[in-house]
Amino acid sequence: MKGPIAAMMAAMAAIKRSGTVLKGDLYFTGVADEEEQGKGTAYMIKNGPHADGVIVGEPTDMRLSPGNKGLEWIEVSFKGKKVHGGRQKEGINAIQMASRFVSKVYDEYVPLLDSREYPVLGAPTINIGTISGGDQPSTVPDHCKIVLDRRMVPSETIEQVYEELRELGEELHREDPRFQCQVRDVFDGLNLLPHLPFLTDENDPIMTTVKDIYNDRGKEIVIEPFPAWTDAGFISSQTQSKCLVLGPGKLKVAHSVDEYIDIDQMEEAAEIYAETALRYCGRK
């Protein structure tokens, strides 16, 4: 986001220096905690400012991203019975139970998610990101935990996501009464805003304004969903603002040792941000 922030500030400075007076209000909000719990954006949503149109600066390579999937981090814990490895038939291996759950996710649940293809955003996804459990190799483990990443489309609800995962566990319990698992939100109790999906209509003024600018510049218009979570999900679900994710830089080099951004693209972004403000807000 560093490149988009610089381009946005340059755009605002250019408008100020030009002496142009806008009919509407133009805000820059540099929010903190975007990578963790979104506290900066939550503060802005509660206290303002609120805008009709919002551009969220992320490295889209200057492609227009009118939406992203929702996000839930979910912990599934498995309970077993600890015994010495030499008497493992008397125990219940929690890691083995976890592996059965993971297999069921990929064998049965993923195909279901693939069938829920949504316009622009594509199909919802699930990723088993971490697994931990057990104490030592010679002991049957009585505990195991996986943490998964679940990406949602607008046709799904958060409640539905948890119900479906719990149903997978209940099916395994019916097959084997020894199977026990609990499903919970990783951030349960923190009172965070829900990470809902968002999708802005392609005919919304924030979209048509930028598309018109691209056409006038002879720049190819590429519209695609942003593959990662953005604060646009918070803003669009909690306010009346219409959001567009747009910025210089490539996501594939973000968070990397060799992270970089092309200066030419930053300059282009600053020009497009400024022109968007002029056209969207209008001039007095």
Which residues make up each language-model segment?
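Metal-dependent amide/peptide-bond hydrolase catalytic core
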Residues: P66, E75-K284
